[in-house]
């Protein structure tokens, strides 16, 4: 039996991609007081999970905690991507003592690279490197990050089946997305947070595990809509929600001011503005459609 021991951090993706890729039959999730919620969300997704709480800062206690879940008759691999630095050192010590492999996921630069260290490869000094293929979709991504959620689609008038003008623009944006390149869901509402967070769009570049969220706003003279969109994107990317690995877009038909663009840049939010929306027939001009798809693909590649 292949057992993967995962050090759980606040971000779930580093503890989700390796077990999905390695197809581990058993997964042990080592968590702390601050990462228990993340561990429970991962447990909902992976098969045959066991949770074990360990000390995040006492090296001796962390080593003993890890040793208590290692079984001699199982092939054990350690995923040291998450957790605290002390937890990583402890896992390395136990792995080396047991002559076990350990892996580390590098997720920077839009590529998911899994480094595997083994005692046979110059005593752990020459890791192998593999790029992890497409393993997650939008629904799985949301499930890994949120306790629960529901979808409402495009923005509607209160007590009505009619779309608002903003909802019509949201629909035009989604109709303009290249279905061959992207997978997406609209109108995401995390449960348990009231109306604090509303995500207009979650989108994934097919063939990758790279996911983004977007706020879609018509724009107005006072730029209240885009400002609200920025606030939503900043809040949605906090560690308690979709976290730091999620790319963020503010999509609008208006040409935004320098002030808004500088504010977005400070928060690493990509603006796609001036999209030439035709209100009468509720469509976006072909040049703007190309711009929209190219910009999203560029940021998710």
Question: What does each of the following model-derived ranges do?
Answer:
Residues 1-76, 89-301:
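Long, low-complexity, Lys/Arg-enriched
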Residues 77-81:
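Periplasmic-binding protein-like
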């Amino acid at each position: 039996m292949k057992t993967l021991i995962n050090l759980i951090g606040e971000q779930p993706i580093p503890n989700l991609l390796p077990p999905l890729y390695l197809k581990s039959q058993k997964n042990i999730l080592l968590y702390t007081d601050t990462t228990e919620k993340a561990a429970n969300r991962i447990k909902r997704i992976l098969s045959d999970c066991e949770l074990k709480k360990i000390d995040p800062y006492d090296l001796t206690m962390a080593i003993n905690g890890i040793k208590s879940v290692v079984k001699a008759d199982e092939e054990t691999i350690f995923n040291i991507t998450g957790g605290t630095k002390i937890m990583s050192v402890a896992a390395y010590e136990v792995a080396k003592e047991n002559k076990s492999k350990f892996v580390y996921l590098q997720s920077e630069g839009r590529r998911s690279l899994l480094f595997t260290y083994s005692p046979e490869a110059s005593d752990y000094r020459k890791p192998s490197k593999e790029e992890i293929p497409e393993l997650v979709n939008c629904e799985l991504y949301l499930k890994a990050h949120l306790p629960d959620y529901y979808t409402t689609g495009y923005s509607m008038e209160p007590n009505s089946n009619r779309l608002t003008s903003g909802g019509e623009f949201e629909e035009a944006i989604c109709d303009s997305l290249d279905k061959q390149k992207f997978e997406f869901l609209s109108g995401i509402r995390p449960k348990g947070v009231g109306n604090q967070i509303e995500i207009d769009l979650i989108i994934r570049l097919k063939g990758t595990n790279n996911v983004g969220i977007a706020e879609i706003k018509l724009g107005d003279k006072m730029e209240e809509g885009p400002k609200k969109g920025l606030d939503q994107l900043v809040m949605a990317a906090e560690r308690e929600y979709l976290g730091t690995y999620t790319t963020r877009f503010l999509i609008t038909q208006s040409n935004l001011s320098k002030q808004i663009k500088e504010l977005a840049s400070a928060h690493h939010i990509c603006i796609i503005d001036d999209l030439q929306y035709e209100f009468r027939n509720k469509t976006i001009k072909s040049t703007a459609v190309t711009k929209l798809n190219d910009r999203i693909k560029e940021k998710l590649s």
